A protein has these predicted regions:
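4′-phosphopantetheine-dependent carrier domains
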Residues: 1-13, 19-23, 43-297
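A short, basic/flexible loop-to-alpha-helix module at the beginning of a structural domain
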Residues: 26-46
Length: 297
């Protein structure tokens, strides 16, 4: 009866529950997180943390702060296979990068390659190399491992490489993600897979590959879209909600600290800072969170 009633009732509420005939719904409320009174062994100096998406954007900024504060050794995981770049390219300013982009795209076209794809790999490689240099400059030990998080065997091998080359994984920060907003009817299977699989299945695969006895903490980086939705983000919202459910299960089943940060839009770095995303968000009067504030959280 309750199910039929819900289906026939006009309401903006999409998640409801019933307990002893009492209708319940999800609600957000402000709460102060109590400080931990005992140290967490997983974040002791020298512990190895695996950080997906940790070489670029928001997650890289957080990983640098996290690694420096606690003296962690970081295994940064990304989807980009690094290509050879000239050392001088890392020092180029915006104008220099623009000139380089034009030259390399022309050369790629002459070789019969997709110019945009060829440049994208170089662009990401430069960003990752710069990021690794920033980790090194702050005295943080960081190693980069390329990996397709949607392929279980590839993930298993990556985790094995991390544990062999760096050490047993004590903690995970799962920040990898992909977002491409568009109307629902324009969503494709490939786009859905690229959005949902790394964010949700990727963490499942990593958890399956790590030593359960050594793993002491799990952190997921999600988005407010995972709770409130977002324009053109049906798949992205689903991915982030799934992430929260998976991390919740980790906390219950493994009895270790595990949580998800559903981040607000960051300024300066991250998906929301892209011109096309920023334009849409600004139309709704959204205020962006400064980089320094986000890292402090």
């Amino acid at each position: 009866h309750s199910t039929v009633t819900e289906l026939c009732t006009k309401s903006d509420i999409i998640e409801v529950g019933y307990r002893a005939a009492t209708r319940m719904q999800m609600a957000s409320q402000e709460a102060v997180v109590p400080e931990r009174t005992t140290p967490l062994e997983a974040v002791s100096r020298g512990s190895v943390w695996l950080v997906t998406g940790g070489a670029r954007g928001v997650t890289a900024a957080c990983a640098r702060a996290f690694g420096k504060q606690y003296g962690l050794r970081l295994a940064l995981v990304g989807s980009t296979e690094l290509v050879a770049v000239e050392p001088g390219w890392l020092d180029l300013d915006d104008a220099g990068v623009k000139t380089l982009k034009g030259r390399l795209m022309v050369e790629a076209k002459q070789r019969g390659e997709d110019p945009r794809r060829a440049w994208k790999v170089v662009e990401k490689t430069i960003e990752i190399r710069r990021s690794l240099a920033a980790f090194d400059a702050e005295g943080i030990e960081a190693h980069y491992f390329p990996c397709d998080l949607s392929e279980q065997e590839v993930v298993r091998q990556m985790v094995a490489d991390v544990q062999c080359q760096v050490g047993p994984v004590r903690g995970i920060v799962h920040g990898a993600g992909f977002e491409s907003a568009c109307r629902f009817e324009k969503k494709t299977h490939a786009g859905f897979s690229a959005t949902v699989f790394p964010k949700a299945l990727g963490l499942e695969y990593i958890l399956a590959a790590t030593d359960e006895k050594m793993l002491g903490a799990v952190i997921g980086f999600g988005s407010t879209s995972g709770r409130f939705g977002g324009h053109g983000q049906a798949d992205y919202a689903m991915a982030n909600d799934l992430l929260a459910k998976i991390v919740g299960r980790v906390r219950a089943d493994r009895n270790i600290p595990a949580t998800v940060f559903h981040w607000h839009a960051w300024d300066e770095v991250g998906m929301a800072s892209r011109p096309e995303s920023r334009f849409v968000l600004e139309q709704f009067g959204l205020k962006f969170m400064p980089l320094a504030e986000g890292v402090q959280h």
